[in-house]
Every structure is written in C-alpha cells, then in structure tokens.
Amino acid sequence: MVFSSNVFLFLFLPVFLGLYYLSGERYRNLLLLIASYVFYAWWRVDFLLLFAGVTVFNYWIGLRIGAAGVRTRAAQRWLILGVVVDLCVLGYFKYANFGVDSLNEIITSFGMQPFVLTHILLPIGISFYTFESISYIIDVYRGDTPATHNLIDFAAFVAIFPHLIAGPVLRFKDLVDQFNHRTHTVDKFAEGCTRFMQGFVKKVFIADTLAALADHCFALQNPTTGDAWLGALAYTAQLYFDFSGYSDMAIGLGLMMGFRFMENFNQPYISQSITEFWRRWHISLSTWLRDYLYISLGGNRGSTFQTYRNLFLTMLLGGLWHGANFTYIIWGAWHGMWLAIERALGVNAAPRVLNPLKWVITFLLVVIGWVIFRAENLQVAWRMYEAMFSFGTWQLSELNRANLTGLQVGTLVLAYLVLAFFGLRQFYNQPLQTKAPKAAANSDEVAADGPASAQPRAPREAAGDPAAIAYSPSGALVYQPSWLSQLPVLATRLALLLLFAASVLKLSAQSYSPFLYFQF
C-alpha cells in the first residue's frame, strides 16, 4: 500500500483516524502499531515476520546494552552483536543477489561455473527500519537515550506507517517523549492535512507526469543531445517532487497523529556547493550518515587524508544504501569525490560575487549525478552521458517528439517555475518586519514606554475590532479588517484544495504511478 492510492485515501486512512481518535490515549500506540503492521502486510504478509523479528531483536539488544552501562566493554560487545546481525539481515536480503551476480561475471570470464542462488525478494522498507534500529542501539550505547522497556512503543516507532516506506529516517531519541505523550489539537491536525495535500499534489500532479517523460528519454536507444538533457532535467525534477512529496505526506500524517517529524528537504536545488546540497537533500539520511558512519570512521579528527577518506567512504556507502547496483555506488563516489574536493579548495569561503557561478556548477553536478542514479545499468548511463556531452543536435529525436505531450512539457516548465519561485523566495527572504518603519516610529501613534512596546497603538474606535495592522510604503498606518489580511492565505488554501482534488481525479484516471523506493 502506498499513500498515493485510492485504497489508502478512501479506506485505510479514514478508518485508522476514526479509530485512533475514538480510542483512549493509552491505547493509541498499540493501535498505531497494529495499523502499521496491516499497512506493511498489505504488500507481503510473510515479510511481516522478518520485520517483527528485527524489531524484537533490537529491543532486546537495547535492554542488554542498557543493563551493561553506557560505553562499557560489555555494552560494546552487545552493540557489535546488534549491528552485525542488523547488517547481515540487510546484506542478505538487499545485496546477496547483487554480490553473487557480480561474482559470477568475474568467474565465468575465466571459464568457471557460476554460483546458483535463488532470487531473493527485497522486503520493502528494510533499509529504513534497519538504519533506525541501528541508530537506536548506538544511542543507547552512547547514553543519548535510555533503553526503553516498552516493547509496544519501540515497535510502533520502528513500524509507524507514515515513514515506513519512504522516510524520513527517524530516531527513537527524538520521538520517545512524543510516544509517551503528544498533544492533539485541531490546528495541528489541520496543519497535517495541509502538509499531506501538498505532498500528494507534488507526487501525483507533478512527479507522476514527469516520470513518463523521463522514462521515455532514458529508454531511447539513440538519444540526441536534446533527448538526453531533457530526460536528465525531467528526472531531476521528478525525483525531487516525488521524494519530497512522500516526505511531506509522511510529516502531514504524523501531525494528524500528534507527532512532529524532522524536515527532510529544504530547497536543495538552490545549493551553491555539494556540501550545502547534502544539508538540504534527504536531511534525515545525511545527518544519519554523519552521526553514525562518518563520525564512527573518525570524522575529521585524523589527518587531512583521513578526513577526505572518511568523506568519500561515507558517501560511497550512502550510495550503496540506495540500492544494490554499481550505478548507486558510482553515484555515491561522485558525491564523495566532490565533497572532498570542496573541502580541499575551501569552496564555502569563496567570495559572494561567485555565488551565481557556484549555483550553476552545483546544479549541473547534481543533474549529472542523477543520470547514473536513474539509469538501470552502466550501459544506459554511458549512453545518456555520451549523448549529453557529444553536443550533437539539440533537436529531439522523431521517436521522442512522437511520444511527447503538451501536458508533460507544461508540467516540466511548471516544476522548474515552482522550484525557482520557492528557491528564490528562500534565498532572498528577509525576516518579516515586526516594528514600525522609522517614519511611523516618530509619530504620536507609537507608544513611548519602552522598546518592547514600539508597536502602533490602535485608535479607540478600533478597539475590539480584530483588524490587521499594516504599513504603507510611506510608513503610515493602515488598518484593514482581519478577513482582508487573510485573503492570500485563504486563496492559497483554496488553490491547494482544488489541486488536491484534481490530483485525486488524476490518480483515479491514470494507470501509471511509479513507486521509486522499492529498492530501499
């Protein structure tokens, strides 16, 4: 089951929320656990046993570490056991096929018989719940969180369905208080609904439309330069709107249940370096890699070479986390290489006048990386790169023109306009003015009894009227009814509601809605 499906929207979610708010507070975590297991079992019931087994094992390891004491030798042995078992489970189900296939390519080239391994099905979400389990037992070992004795709460944390299939990567220490007690308000629920609708529109209205365009460009056997760049740019936008859309939906669903999850994206395509990009893209994963892998490797505590090595290895393994394919390994190495280069060159200390150039270079490096991330294999990636940098004809191939629709082109343009608008708004955003301009500050209408009160005082006749206070360009006070000041907000919400309704209709009508996270 996925969020962008009719069965989730019209059956699972309303039934769950109804039961959730009808139940008492003490039963809500148990209900959340049961609902999350139903959500997961909708895909495969048999893998639910593996899921539950990993959960119970890490709960037990956490208790053993907690009993042994913070950072003791005994606790370290329990931690090593837990991490090794978790990685073995992840390695077997996610990487065994890849490892055997790679080994067979080598040994068959020497005339040897290949190994035979029955195809192993990848349990959905295993990368997320394995990483979250590992972070929990490491935090218990470090003393960052106490070992929980409540199996229901821990199992609900690992399985909580909003984040289960596409993130964010959560940490028990950040949510333990919310599992013990969380507030439920109408405002928080409404905020969650708004956030969910935003993500749904991103995924269904934009990402799904761009998916068909990107898929077609990457499938061309003889792409032109125009075809290749069109496909790369389409996938760049598709991946962001798909992934951030799922994160928005997860955060929104969490708010509906009283949780606040960490933000996962922060306008990554306005980044002026690869270093900044990883502070804005998939934040929950990048911070996990920093806190539990990069620091464990030594971070920047060793020599300069060791620091660069640790950066490179962290991103290499981060690439492998995304999928069992050489394309992901190379993509991770690509980012690791540029992180090391930027650190060596001191890119972040470059003059501000170079910021536009830094943005262009960073965006191109990210787009180039997405090509091999998207490619099914190295051959497809090479074909795309060859077309992109041969600088042949920029005209689209006849086959591509025949399949290209006006909706796809319009959605691609819309996607980049949205990225540009919100990116520039954040880039140039200044804090909202909370004090009167200088011209008004000297007028008789401003109280003079201290800095904190340097706000305009409403006339007597306005007392009791919930009017919004604004300033004209000259600094003169302008009083307007509260409903007028709310018009932009109301218009935005109405537009979002209409887009959400259109996206639901589109979902019902379309037969293609790719799920990008089956490899995670």
Curated annotation (Swiss-Prot):
Family: Belongs to the membrane-bound acyltransferase family.
Gene Ontology MF terms in the entry: acyltransferase activity
Protein name: Probable alginate O-acetylase AlgI
Pathway in which this enzyme or protein is active: Glycan biosynthesis; alginate biosynthesis
Keyword Ion transport among record annotations: no
Catalytic EC class: transferase
A cellular component annotation (GO) from this entry: plasma membrane
Function noted in UniProt: Together with AlgJ and AlgF, forms an inner membrane complex which probably interacts with the alginate polymerization-transport complex and adds acetyl groups at the O-2 and O-3 positions of mannuronate residues. Acetylation of alginate is important for the architecture of biofilms and increases resistance to opsonic killing in the host.
Subcellular location(s) of the protein: Cell inner membrane
Superkingdom as given in the UniProt entry: Bacteria
A single GO BP: alginic acid biosynthetic process
Xref: Pfam families: MBOAT (PF03062)
Gene source species: Pseudomonas aeruginosa (strain ATCC 15692 / DSM 22644 / CIP 104116 / JCM 14847 / LMG 12228 / 1C / PRS 101 / PAO1)
Signal sequence range: none
Membrane topology value: Multi-pass membrane protein
Active site: 322
Keywords assigned: Acyltransferase, Alginate biosynthesis, Cell inner membrane, Cell membrane, Membrane, Transferase, Transmembrane, Transmembrane helix
InterPro entries per UniProt: Ac/AlaTfrase_AlgI/DltB, AlgI, MB_O-acyltransferase, MBOAT_fam
Keyword Transmembrane helix attributed: yes
EC assignment: 2.3.1.-
